[in-house]
């Protein structure tokens, strides 16, 4: 009868709606898991449709930050693998929170090193990007000092000594790689200079290039 057909259709529609809800929940969960492998700014620009996942780069003026842990190899030799893994993950967790607070784009972790940049995909202007970068570095050094006190109280005799380098200049930024596997990263001489500045910094200090210094001179002198 007609009423029976209506009920049958209603049941079918309800079943389809439940399947769609389940599928949407699965996709939302999967999306959140994938987001852990991307900087939040990049993730949002991709999933909002603002950015295509294609091999494409553009030239932009960025402020680039490199850091690493001085004598990290020697530190790993003094500690058990489980200890160094715990400390490194805690360190990266704290540093990442500071980077995101200041609006930095976390490019990658390489061993004990971090690469972060300002100016893409969001920018507040050259001077403000550079100032945010400097505030980030100072906040990180302060937090590392606090972590070292905590770790010494836990019996870690020689915790992390972090050195940092900051530079401002033009880089190519975007998706590099192949159609099957790509990274959103930066490439260029200015990024290499930031890495070199980090390598000459003393532990617990930040070395800033003249280009960055010129943008934040008033902040430093104040």
Could you say what each language-model-derived stretch is?
Residues 28-30, 52-135:
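Catalytic NTP-binding/metal-coordinating core of nucleotidyl cyclase/transferase enzymes
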Residues 3-59, 220-221:
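Regulatory cytosolic signal-relay segments
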Residues 42, 84, 91, 110, ...:
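Helical mechanochemical/support elements of P-loop NTPase systems and associated helical scaffolds
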Residues 89-104, 120-164, 189-191, 195-198:
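Alpha-helical scaffold within the catalytic cores of cyclic-nucleotide enzymes
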Residues 117-128, 164-182, 203-205:
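Catalytic strand-loop-helix junctions within cyclic-nucleotide turnover domains
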Residues 171, 200-222:
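Cytosolic regulatory/linker segments at or just downstream of nucleotide-handling modules
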Residues 154-156, 176-188:
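Short, surface-exposed loop/helix-turn segments at secondary-structure junctions
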Residues 110-111, 152-163, 205-212:
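Acidic/histidine metal-binding catalytic segments
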């Amino acid at each position: 009868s007609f009423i029976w057909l209506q009920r049958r259709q209603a049941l079918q529609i309800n079943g389809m709606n439940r399947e769609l809800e389940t599928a949407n929940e699965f996709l939302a969960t999967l999306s959140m898991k994938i987001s852990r492998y991307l900087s939040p700014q990049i993730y949002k620009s991709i999933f909002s449709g603002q950015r295509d996942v294609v091999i494409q780069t553009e030239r932009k003026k960025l402020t680039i930050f490199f850091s690493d842990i001085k004598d990290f190899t020697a530190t790993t030799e003094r500690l058990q693998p489980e200890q160094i893994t715990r400390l490194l993950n805690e360190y990266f967790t704290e540093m990442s929170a500071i980077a995101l607070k200041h609006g930095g784009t976390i490019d990658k972790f390489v061993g004990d090193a971090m690469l972060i940049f300002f100016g893409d995909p969001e920018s507040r202007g050259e001077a403000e990007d550079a100032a945010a970068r400097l505030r980030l570095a100072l906040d990180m050094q302060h937090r590392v000092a606090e972590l070292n006190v905590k770790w010494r109280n836990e019996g870690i005799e020689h915790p992390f000594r972090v050195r940092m380098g900051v530079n401002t200049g033009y880089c190519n930024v975007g998706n590099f790689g192949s159609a099957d596997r790509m990274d959103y990263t930066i490439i260029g001489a200015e990024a290499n200079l930031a890495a070199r500045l980090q390598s000459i910094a003393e532990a617990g200090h930040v070395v800033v290039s003249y280009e960055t210094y010129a943008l934040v001179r008033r902040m430093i002198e104040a």
